């Protein structure tokens, strides 16, 4: 039986495994992944031509292995193949390759109680899809993240449709590449308005296709795409400065008193402070949106973010970096791409795609860039709530009433403490408390049954712009939690904290009403995790650099060793 199994061999899983082994070098650890190569989102089978990472060189790496400069483009952009190669190099350096089992899709995870008369404690049992194999383990780390199970919309008539329908996740499959390069495929429809839709449209146009780009009028609208650079610096770097977080109200300050700035600008702030905050975000949004000249064409106007200059602050749709800005020339010319702000209601014979305004399009290929499932199928629906995951199954009446009351109380506290969030656009659908993630610190179930105690943790279940920095912090926190080296509050305090952070996310980020989100607040979140661990999160030499400087993964180099040293343990990697 394994001591711990990590499910997922992408960014989250690799650093979770490396960190656990650094703390517990003798542990029997296994990584499993359903793909045929490591990398998760950046596995070989998910890469396709022109795909480029949003983060620039120096930001998309872990603290203990720099990405080689000769693998990236001259302007610092990182090709997808370089990301995959980097993760392979990381797994090799830290001796993870022999512990990884690929082509192993876990169909179900269940908790088995201890057998009477057996000396073994309760264990987790993982069932491998397509076989009768079951793998036992004492502990599990779920590192599949929030982009592993594609969401495909229901499209009536799909069986009669004579073209091909696929999710953007499949764009890297060899057969998809063959299909796109086939000269008989001339017309394509892309459905969705996220960053992946922009990438799909670019790929198809460069392959010589004509594209009808369909984005629903309802929902969060198209992503607000930022330019590659702003004020002479890569725009992605903005997120890696504490300066941006200063203007974002958040609940992650765990010190006795919130900072002076937080109190003045966000905590029970007055009208002038709120105007200053909104003004800051509108000016920044203007600078980021100005290069695209939305009013230059009908296509451009249809890609205008839903809330215009307020789209950056409230984030009705996920943000993205325009890794291929030349796409805007195609968008504005309209010669080979037409944008429709409609929904697809059906597919028909003769390769027809029918929109809700009655317009019929012709398509040899339909690419659904429609995001990811918020549901997680590793656990049965009736077991999901017990492990902190959202579920279609309801809580028992007592627990449901408790969570509803906690939600209401937490929401009231959030708007009292951060009045600006009272102006958050009203959600379009009512919320079930069962739709929330109930994860303390977004890592540990808020209320574990006694048989589950400290045996399950999650890494990568918070969407941020600082992935490597966040994943490293989460991995150390999860390892400390699973090994009993971290003190955590009791269930009552944990569930109150979970209700509070969930209430904040719903108010702060519109797109966070589907999955946990902390776009501009990830550094304060990381601070909180390291404070829990007794590690200093402030890595800069002085206050000016701390506030205005760029935070990179390398700033946290050696953090695991620091934590081990604080516990009087020698790190074998540094001996």
From Swiss-Prot:
Signal peptide: 1-17
Biochemical pathway: Antifungal biosynthesis
GO MF terms, alphabetically ordered: monooxygenase activity
SUPFAM superfamilies reported in the protein's UniProt record: FAD/NAD(P)-binding domain
Residues binding FAD, per UniProt: 106
E.C. no: 1.-.-.-
Cofactor(s) listed in the protein's UniProt record: FAD
Oxidoreductase keyword on record: yes
Glycan-bearing residues: 239, 295
Record keywords: FAD, Flavoprotein, Glycoprotein, Monooxygenase, Oxidoreductase, Signal
Domain of life per record: Eukaryota
Family to which this protein belongs: Belongs to the FAD-binding monooxygenase family.
Name of the featured protein: FAD-dependent monooxygenase rstn6
Species annotation: Aspergillus nomiae NRRL (strain ATCC 15546 / NRRL 13137 / CBS 260.88 / M93)
Lineage, opening ranks: Eukaryota, Fungi, Dikarya, Ascomycota, Pezizomycotina
């Amino acid at each position: 039986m394994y001591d711990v199994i990590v499910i997922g061999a992408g960014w989250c899983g690799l650093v979770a495994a490396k960190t656990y082994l650094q703390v517990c070098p003798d542990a029997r650890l296994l990584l499993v992944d359903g793909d045929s190569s490591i990398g998760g989102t950046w596995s070989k089978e998910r890469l396709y031509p022109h795909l480029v990472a949003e983060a620039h060189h120096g930001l998309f790496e872990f603290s203990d292995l720099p990405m080689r400069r000769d693998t990236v483009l001259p302007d610092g952009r990182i090709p997808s193949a370089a990301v995959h190669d980097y993760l392979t190099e990381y797994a090799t350096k830290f001796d993870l390759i022999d512990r990884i089992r690929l082509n192993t899709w876990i169909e179900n995870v269940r908790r088995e109680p201890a057998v009477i008369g057996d000396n073994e404690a309760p264990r987790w049992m993982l069932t491998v899809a397509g076989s009768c194999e079951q793998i036992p383990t004492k502990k599990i780390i779920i590192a599949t993240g929030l982009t592993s199970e594609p969401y495909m919309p229901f499209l009536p008539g799909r069986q009669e449709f004579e073209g091909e329908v696929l999710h953007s996740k499949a764009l890297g499959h060899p057969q998809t590449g063959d299909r796109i390069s086939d000269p008989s495929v001339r017309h394509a429809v892309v459905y969705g308005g996220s960053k992946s839709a922009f990438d799909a449209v670019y790929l198809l146009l460069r392959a010589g296709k004509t594209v009808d780009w369909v984005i629903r009028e309802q929902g969060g609208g198209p992503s607000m795409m930022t330019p590659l650079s702003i004020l002479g610096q890569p725009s992605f770097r903005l997120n890696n400065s504490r300066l941006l977080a200063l203007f974002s109200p958040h609940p992650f300050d765990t010190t006795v008193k919130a900072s002076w700035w937080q109190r003045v600008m966000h905590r029970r702030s007055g009208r002038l402070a709120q105007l200053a905050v909104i003004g800051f975000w509108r000016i920044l949004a203007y600078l980021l949106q100005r290069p695209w000249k939305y009013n230059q064409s009908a296509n451009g106007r249809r890609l205008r973010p839903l809330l215009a200059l307020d789209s950056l602050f409230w984030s009705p749709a996920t943000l993205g970096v325009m890794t291929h800005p030349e796409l805007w020339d195609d968008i504005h010319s309209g010669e080979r791409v037409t944008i429709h702000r409609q929904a697809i209601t059906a597919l028909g014979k003769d390769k027809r795609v029918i929109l809700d305004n009655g317009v019929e399009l012709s398509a040899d290929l339909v690419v659904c860039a429609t995001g990811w499932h918020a549901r997680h199928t590793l656990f049965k629906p009736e077991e999901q709530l017990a492990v902190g995951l959202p579920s279609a199954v309801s809580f028992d009446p007592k627990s449901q009433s408790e969570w509803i009351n906690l939600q209401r109380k937490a929401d009231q506290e959030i708007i009292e403490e951060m009045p600006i969030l009272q102006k958050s656009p009203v959600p379009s659908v009512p919320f079930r408390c069962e739709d929330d993630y109930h994860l303390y610190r977004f890592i540990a179930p808020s209320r574990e049954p006694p048989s589950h105690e400290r045996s399950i943790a999650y890494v990568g279940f918070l969407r941020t712009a600082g992935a490597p920095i966040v994943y490293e912090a989460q991995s150390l926190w999860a390892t400390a939690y699973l090994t009993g080296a971290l003190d955590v509050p009791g269930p009552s305090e944990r569930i109150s904290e979970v209700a509070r952070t969930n209430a904040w996310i719903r108010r702060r980020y519109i797109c966070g009403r589907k999955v946990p989100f902390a776009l501009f607040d990830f550094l304060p979140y990381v601070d909180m995790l390291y404070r829990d661990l007794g590690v200093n999160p402030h890595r800069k030499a002085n206050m000016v650099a701390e506030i205005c400087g760029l935070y990179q993964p390398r700033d946290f180099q050696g953090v695991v060793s620091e934590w081990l040293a604080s516990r009087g343990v020698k790190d074998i990697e540094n001996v």
